[in-house]
Curated annotation (Swiss-Prot):
Distribution of this protein across tissues and organs: Expressed specifically in roots.
Entry superkingdom: Eukaryota
Keyword annotations from UniProtKB, A to Z: Heme, Iron, Membrane, Metal-binding, Methyltransferase, Transferase, Transmembrane, Transmembrane helix
Lineage, uppermost ranks: Eukaryota, Viridiplantae, Streptophyta, Embryophyta, Tracheophyta
Knockout or disruption consequences: No visible phenotype.
PANTHER family in the record: 24-HYDROXYCHOLESTEROL 7-ALPHA-HYDROXYLASE (PTHR24304:SF2), CYTOCHROME P450 FAMILY 7 (PTHR24304)
Organism of this sequence: Arabidopsis thaliana (Mouse-ear cress)
Gene3D superfamilies, A to Z: Cytochrome P450
Transmembrane segments annotated in the record for this chain: 5-25
GO cellular component, one term: membrane
An MF annotation (GO) of this entry: iron ion binding
Chief localization: membrane
Name of the protein: Putative sterol 14-demethylase-like protein
InterPro entries xrefs: CYP450_sterol_14alpha_dmase (IPR050529), Cyt_P450_E_grp-IV (IPR002403), Cyt_P450_sf (IPR036396)
Membrane topology: Single-pass membrane protein
Length: 145
C-alpha cells in the first residue's frame, strides 16, 4: 500500500509542476505579444454580458454622453459577443477614415448596405473593386466648373 501512495504522490507533484511551468511559459509569451499601443478602455456594466446591451438599447446617444467624460474619446462597449469601439471627435475619428483595410475592416457593416445598391455593387465586392467603384462614383458626382 505504501508503494501506491508514494507513486500517487510523485505523480501528483509532477503534474502540478508541469502545469505551473506551462502557465509561466504561456504568461511570459503573452506579455511579449502585447501591443505597444494600449487598448481602449472597456465599459464595465452590470449584469455582465447583457448590462451594456440593456443600456445601449435604452438609448445609444445617452450611453455615449454618459461614458464619454468617464472613458474618454475612444472606448469599447461589449454587446453580447461583439465589441464595438467608439471614436468620438475629429482628433480620433480621422484614423477611422484613413486606416488601411487590413487594420480596420468595415466588411461586417457593409453587409447591411448590400440591399441598398444590390449584389455585386459597392458594398458587395472586394476592397480593390470597391475603391475603383468609389473613384468612379466620386468623379461622376463632382460638379464641373
Amino acid at each position: 500500500m505504501d508503494w501506491d501512495y508514494y507513486t500517487l504522490l510523485k505523480t501528483s507533484v509532477a503534474i502540478i509542476i508541469v502545469f505551473v511551468v506551462a502557465k509561466l511559459i504561456t504568461s511570459s509569451k503573452s506579455k511579449k505579444k502585447t501591443s505597444v499601443v494600449p487598448l481602449p478602455p472597456v465599459l464595465q456594466a452590470w449584469p455582465p454580458f447583457i448590462g451594456s446591451l440593456i443600456r445601449f438599447m435604452k438609448g445609444p446617444i445617452v450611453l455615449l454622453r454618459e461614458e464619454y467624460p468617464k472613458l474618454g474619446s475612444v472606448f469599447t462597449v461589449k454587446l453580447l459577443h461583439k465589441n464595438i469601439t467608439f471614436l468620438i471627435g475629429p482628433e480620433v475619428s480621422s484614423h477611422f477614415f484613413n486606416a488601411y483595410e487590413s487594420e480596420l475592416s468595415q466588411k461586417e457593416i457593409y453587409k447591411f448596405n448590400v440591399p441598398t445598391f444590390g449584389p455585386g455593387v459597392v458594398f458587395d465586392v472586394d476592397y480593390p473593386v470597391r475603391m475603383e467603384q468609389f473613384r468612379f462614383f466620386s468623379s461622376a458626382l463632382k460638379v464641373n466648373n
